[in-house]
Amino acid sequence: MAIQHPDIQPAVNHSVQVAIAGAGPVGLMMANYLGQMGIDVLVVEKLDKLIDYPRAIGIDDEALRTMQSVGLVENVLPHTTPWHAMRFLTPKGRCFADIQPMTDEFGWPRRNAFIQPQVDAVMLEGLSRFPNVRCLFSRELEAFSQQDDEVTLHLKTAEGQRETIKAQWLVACDGGASFVRRTLNVPFEGKTAPNQWIVVDIANDPLSTPHIYLCCDPVRPYVSAALPHAVRRFEFMVMPGETEEQLREPQNMRKLLSKVLPNPDNVELIRQRVYTHNARLAQRFRIDRVLLAGDAAHIMPVWQGQGYNSGMRDAFNLAWKLALVIQGKARDALLDTYQQERRDHAKAMIDLSVTAGNVLAPPKRWQGTLRDGVSWLLNYLPPVKRYFLEMRFKPMPQYYGGALVREGEAKHSPVGKMFIQPKVTLENGDVTLLDNAIGANFAVIGWGCNPLWGMSDEQIQQWRALGTRFIQVVPEVQIHTAQDNHDGVLHVGDTQGRLRSWFAQHNASLVVMRPDRFVAATAIPQTLGNTLNKLASVMTLTRPDADVSVEKVA
């Protein structure tokens, strides 16, 4: 499967607002988001095309919500398998941990299998929507330098020609071996696992059983995963003394596959590849005008499928902030909140992935025996079983500082958490997901109240200049009540009753939602104005031009 890049004219001595190093998933997502915000973007990739073999196989609800934010989710969904369960098995085949959450609080299934090259291709094609975005393949980044107001990149083409790019900002999405990170001497702290795994992808799935199974066999742990489009992935631990070359030999590959298939000779191999699992975290995510994202900032073992999804979180968190800074709507201090918000959660996902790997393949054999016995007992405790079944162990992103205003008891506050995405009913009767009604914008969402009531004219002017959507949520039966309509306010019905439950639970009637769908603040009408002033301050927002007149509607 070859994904050719479009015929693009070279950019020699060109100036752009953002240069992105790396056309992997994080770089492509950054380019799509910035593209829809009107930012001039240039993506440079040293390969001559997208990587066309399967890599990541798990995409979660947060990543799908990110795809939705750039208008690509409907193109991505055909390459996914929703509600993809993960089951840990003992050597005898007994399931001791079943992970299959059935919740969709963010609008999408929490666990999904997917084919990464096809989703990457969707994102690359998505760039064609934006005349302000270009992607240059076969460009190796040889050097770069930072000045006070720009970054200069020096590239070499496949033909040996030199090109120079000047950008206001550089986003490094160039992978775990990031040239940008190494050039800046940013420590990449962590460790490399002592064992390796060989990944075998097979077409025309010879098993065709659903879900993903992690067999905790002390002789040789392995993974069996059903993927979309009839692809089967097997992963086998490489045992001490074995090499990739040995395992690639037909007789040894046949021996491996005979562990999981009745006829190991009758398969269509897509590829075989040995991986080393790393757990590393960059010490800094921002170095002046350079920002690290995705694997350039953090890498983790695959066992919870969170490497790809963590990169999507980086892109969603960073892109809207970078757009505001470039548009002059916020000072560049806002970009410091990127590391402040993302680094701790990335570390939590690394720790979770390492723990899952130790469950699959404990360092000591006695630990596996203990695991099997304890898990058997815990399965008889319903709260513990639900804890795993509903994936409550997954650290949900929660920010305690950054671009937000937290007041009251931090432990139970929704501030710094992702807001829910239920279905809402529009005034024309259409039912849609909440984000579709908001777009790539801030939102001030009020339960039953006019969100403009507690705002001054100056505040309305400032937040409208950011593209903020003001939304009044009412019970669905009230959607056509004229007395509740206010100019400049979107009126939506609470189709599923989830928004009413959310506001009741959190003792607030107004929420300020950021473009990345995180709760920046909560309030009631009488405190909203003061809260927005605090939020504008912590986000270092600039004031709009004074000659822009805005009429407040009470």
UniProtKB/Swiss-Prot annotation:
Keywords, alphabetical: Aromatic hydrocarbons catabolism, FAD, Flavoprotein, NAD, Oxidoreductase
SUPFAM superfamilies, A to Z: FAD/NAD(P)-binding domain (SSF51905)
Positions of FAD binding: 17-46, 285-295
EC number: 1.14.13.127
A molecular function GO annotation: 3-(3-hydroxyphenyl)propionate hydroxylase activity
Involved pathway(s): Aromatic compound metabolism; 3-phenylpropanoate degradation
Reaction catalyzed: 3-(3-hydroxyphenyl)propanoate + NADH + O2 + H(+) = 3-(2,3-dihydroxyphenyl)propanoate + NAD(+) + H2O; (2E)-3-(3-hydroxyphenyl)prop-2-enoate + NADH + O2 + H(+) = (2E)-3-(2,3-dihydroxyphenyl)prop-2-enoate + NAD(+) + H2O
Role noted for this protein: Catalyzes the insertion of one atom of molecular oxygen into position 2 of the phenyl ring of 3-(3-hydroxyphenyl)propionate (3-HPP) and hydroxycinnamic acid (3HCI).
Record family assignment: Belongs to the PheA/TfdB FAD monooxygenase family.
PANTHER family in UniProt: 3-(3-HYDROXY-PHENYL)PROPIONATE/3-HYDROXYCINNAMIC ACID HYDROXYLASE, FAD-BINDING MONOOXYGENASE
Protein name, per record: 3-(3-hydroxy-phenyl)propionate/3-hydroxycinnamic acid hydroxylase
Species, as recorded: Shigella sonnei (strain Ss046)
